[in-house]
Amino acid sequence: MSANEIVTSEIQDKVCTISFFNPKGNSLSTLHLLRLTKEFNDVSYNDGINVVVLKSSGDGAFCGGASIDELVKFDRFEKAKEFFFAFGKLLLTMIRCQKPIVARVHGKIVGGGIGLVSACDYAIAKKEASLRLSELTIGIGPFVISPFVIRKSGISAFSHLSLDTQWRDAEWGKNFGLYSKVVDTNEELDQEIKKLADDLSKFNLNSLMKLKEIFWEKTENWEQLIDERAEISARLILSEIASGRLQKIIGNQ
C-alpha cells in the first residue's frame, strides 16, 4: 500500500478533508505519521483553506493508535524513539496548524487514537466511538500523548483512562470534553460535520487563526517534552515485558 493510498486530502470551498486508512484498525505506521504530518504542514500555510476535517476510512475503528506490527519489530532504542517522536511530532504539527481541525469520529479510538482526537480542536463522534487507553496492558504507557489528552480532557480523565484500561462509551468522552457532540447515525455525523465545516469556511480566516493560537497557547516547550516522553516509551517498548505481550497480540491476530 503506497503513501498516496493510506493518506489522502481534498480541498473544496475552503474545507480540506484529510483521510487516512489502514486495514488493521486504522492504526498508524511510520508512513502514516509522516504523511499526515506533511498534510497538516501544507494546510497550515494554504490561505485557500479555512478549516480541516480529519476522518478515517472504513466502518470499524476510527483509529487504533500505534501500529502493533511496527512496535513488535523494534530491536534498537534509536528506531523505537524515532517512531514515538514521529507520533508526537504529528500531534504537535496538528496543534500548531493555523487552521481549526474538526475530527469525524465514526468508530472506536484506542491508545494513540485518543491523542489524535485530543490534538483536534473539535470532535463530532458517533455513539459507537468508545475509547480506551490500553498502553499499560502492553507494558508501556501513554506518555507521548499525555500532554494533549490532559490539555483536552484534564488530568482526572487522563488518570482514569490510563490506570483503568477498560472501555468507556462515547458519552463518557463527551462528558470529559474529548468529543463536542455525539450522534446516532452516519447520516447525522456527516450532516453535523458538513454544517460546522460550511460555517467555518465562511468566517474570517484571521479570526480563526487567532482563536487557534489561543486554544494551544503556552505549549511552546512541548517539543522538548515530547522528546523526553518518546525516550521513555522507547526504553519501555524494548523491555522483556512489552516484547512478550506484543508477541502474544501478534500471535492472536
Where would I find each of the regions flagged by the language model?
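C-terminal alpha-helix plus adjacent terminal tail
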Residues: 1-13, 22, 45-47, 59, ...
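Conserved CoA-thioester-binding segment of acyl-CoA-metabolizing enzymes
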Residues: 1-55, 92
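Terminal peptide-recognition signature
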Residues: 18, 36, 54, 67, ...
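Phosphate-coordinating loops and pocket residues in cytosolic domains that bind phosphorylated ligands
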Residues: 30, 64, 73, 163, ...
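A general structural signal for well-ordered alpha-helical segments in protein cores
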Residues: 33, 68, 87, 146, ...
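Glycine- (often His-adjacent) and acidic-residue-rich active-site loop
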Residues: 35, 56-90, 109
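Catalytic-core regions built around general acid/base machinery
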Residues: 39, 86-98
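Crotonase-fold acyl-CoA enzyme core
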Residues: 93-205
